[in-house]
Swiss-Prot record:
Organism of provenance: Bradyrhizobium sp. (strain ORS 278)
Gene Ontology, cellular component aspect: ribonucleoprotein complex; ribosome
Listed name of the protein: Small ribosomal subunit protein uS8
NCBIfam families: PRK00136.1
Gene3D superfamilies linked: 3.30.1370.30, 3.30.1490.10
Keyword list, A-Z: Ribonucleoprotein, Ribosomal protein, RNA-binding, rRNA-binding
Keyword Membrane listed: no
GO molecular function, one term: rRNA binding
UniProt GO BP: translation
Protein family membership: Belongs to the universal ribosomal protein uS8 family.
Chain's gene name: rpsH
Keyword field contains Iron-sulfur: no
Length: 132
């Protein structure tokens, strides 16, 4: 299946799986999705992920979702920059999500990273999505 916006597809799969209290969800594999998942894992929003290779040559990523007291750890996940309307920001104007309780995930020249990492590295970039 071809998707025009792989990040929105990933976010939607995570959101839908958590609404149904699934423990795992799979998504087509790509380097960008893996680096986004690495940020979510390091920030504690998912348990982990694993890349699986199929005999046909395509890869798939299995994501282990995280729950606390039966409730999803990710309360809100929202796409900011979309293919029709890209949102870029400088390091000075990086958005704070819920007064610092959530994170923004950015695509920067130094790779995909959370907003606090971008502030530390003094780089801006495209705001992909926010998580709370």
């Amino acid at each position: 299946m071809s998707t025009h916006d792989p990040i929105s597809d990933l976010i939607t799969r995570i959101r839908n799986a958590q609404m149904r209290s699934k423990s795992k969800v799979t998504t087509p594999g790509s380097k960008m999705r893996a680096s986004v998942l690495e940020v979510l894992k390091s920030e504690g929003y998912i348990r982990g992920y694993a890349t699986m290779e199929h005999p046909s040559g395509r890869s798939e990523i299995e994501i282990e979702l995280k729950y606390f007291d039966g409730e999803p750890v990710i309360r809100e996940i929202e796409r900011v920059s979309k293919p029709g309307r890209r949102v870029y920001t400088s390091v000075k104007n990086l958005p704070r999500v819920n007064n610092g309780l959530g994170i923004s995930v950015l695509s920067t020249p130094k790779g995909i990273m959370a907003d606090h990492s971008a502030r530390d590295a003094n780089v801006g970039g495209e705001v992909l999505f926010t998580v709370f």
